[in-house]
Amino acid sequence: MLEQARNTLQMEADAILELVPRVDEHFSAAVAMILDCPGRVVITGMGKSGIIGRKMAATFASTGTPSFYLHPAEGIHGDLGMVTESDVVIALSNSGETGEVLHILPSLRRIGAKLIAMVGNAESSLAKNSDITLDVGVSQEACPLGLAPTSSTTAAL
């Protein structure tokens, strides 16, 4: 049991280290976009990405950056009215193909909000339709059962 716990932690650490070379000009551009945002930082994502999004929004708010989480399914049904052209939207999707997230993209474009994608697939539809893409993909999840998105959610944080 201890060995399995150590292996899991090592896999998580390795996944984070995979990101180091990807802290590049895209990362700098995303930070600049957020710092220059005259509105709020809106985070969206489904499932586990949504849980990470809620945590990110809370962290932004704690550090003085106006932020909130927008559930994309609720966005489809009217909550996009909370988003303005002054906002930056960060959309999280490991696959970059999450239907609910992709469904709100045309409306976000019409509103005029800027869009940062955090994806595990830099060639995905979400990545291709964003202003800035951050590739946070991992080569392996740390879940010993192969069921839970462990390393990918840690990388997104």
Where are these regions (language model features)?
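An N-terminal, well-structured beta->alpha segment
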Residues: M1-D36
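Glycine-rich phosphate-binding loops that contact phosphosugars or nucleotide phosphates
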Residues: G39-M46, G50-L157
